[in-house]
Design a protein with these regions (language model features):
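Phosphate/nucleotide-binding beta-alpha loop and adjacent structural elements of enzyme active sites
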Residues: 1-200
Length: 200
């Protein structure tokens, strides 16, 4: 299942099995999407914040790549609602890279409990008014997930990375998390192997 709120980009993906042509948020709403046509993958529900560009090692000559070229209003819904609408009852793997909206997406997870979650986390956000990274991690802990790994993304000029991909799995230290893993043992092992968390 792919999520793509920009109509022109969603049309390019029409040959895929499931495309959700909406934005994801913590509730059904309308949000403004700030589009960076020079760097579409960096489009966001939040406006870029060039004060932090230096921390991401973005040179001034590249600032134009991160300039908002247009903005559109997009229909947003929760992830759980959209998955139910296409009759997907179970989610094994969830990857979230939404340039700041990761926490809002996770708040819309409903009763879905993936066995493997990969989420982009900014320690120093490139966007204005993005919730602090620790709120995202705390939310996942409240959903009974634990952080097992992170990998630095891109370049940065700080001693700790400006942004990372973090991997979360069900909390194996309690009965609920352990049971979720056991029920999906083969899938869990496969995902752990694919993402280099286990060695044969």
């Amino acid at each position: 299942v792919l999520i793509e709120p920009i109509n022109s980009e969603a049309k390019k993906l029409e040959n895929k099995k499931f495309i959700i042509n909406k934005g994801l948020w913590s509730s059904k709403t309308k949000k403004r999407l700030y589009i960076l046509d020079n760097r579409l993958g960096s489009s966001s529900m939040y406006e870029p914040n060039n004060i932090n560009f230096d921390l991401h090692n973005i040179k001034e000559k590249k600032y134009s790549d991160y300039k908002v070229t247009r903005s559109i209003e997009v229909e947003c819904d929760t992830l759980s609602s959209q998955l139910e609408s296409i009759n997907i009852r179970h989610l094994d793997y969830l990857k979230i890279d939404t340039q700041g909206a990761e926490l809002e997406v996770l708040k819309g997870l409903g009763n879905y409990r993936p066995i493997f979650i990969k989420v982009e986390v900014h320690f120093f956000s490139m966007y204005r008014n993005v919730p602090s990274w620790h709120k995202l991690i705390n939310h996942l802990y409240e959903l009974n997930y634990v952080l097992i790994d992170w990998k630095t993304i891109g370049s940065h000029s700080t001693r700790i990375p400006a942004e990372t991909d973090m991997i979360f799995i069900p909390n194996f230290n309690n009965e609920i998390g352990e049971e979720l893993i056991k029920k999906n043992k083969k899938k869990f092992i496969s995902l752990m192997l694919i993402f280099g968390q286990l060695k044969l």
